[in-house]
Amino acid sequence: MTQRLRIALIAHDQKKDDMVAFARAHEQALSRYDIVATGTTGGLIQDACPSLNIHRVKSGPLGGDQQIGAMIAEGTVEVLIFFIDPLSPLPHDVDVKALTRLGSVYDIPMALNRATAEKLVRALD
């Protein structure tokens, strides 16, 4: 049995609505993959897209970013879609840098904004 690709979905507070809209627009495509998301983002997506089975980890500031980073390092998350808000001060900026660094170290496809995420999901489909 082949394992399904696992995609991580994360969004900063000011980008959560955009992530929900993205997930809703691509619900059919995303349903073919295992989805992991940080707590609040995952809950919002699950409410908007009930057909998606989302594994929720802790909220980002409570360690969810690190949990997903560990999954990247273990090879159990193969794609990262992280809608970053570049205009808001990030109190957990170190966590963001650590997560995107791991995405680069382990050479996984990574989208940090909706335009790139749109292209990435179409390429996976």
UniProtKB/Swiss-Prot annotation:
It catalyses: dihydroxyacetone phosphate = methylglyoxal + phosphate. Pfam families: MGS. GO terms for biological process: methylglyoxal biosynthetic process. Its EC number is 4.2.3.3. Residues 1-125 form the MGS-like domain. One of its GO terms (cellular component) is cytosol. Belongs to the methylglyoxal synthase family. Catalyzes the formation of methylglyoxal from dihydroxyacetone phosphate. This is Methylglyoxal synthase. The lineage of its organism: Bacteria, Pseudomonadati, Pseudomonadota, Alphaproteobacteria, Hyphomicrobiales. The gene is mgsA.
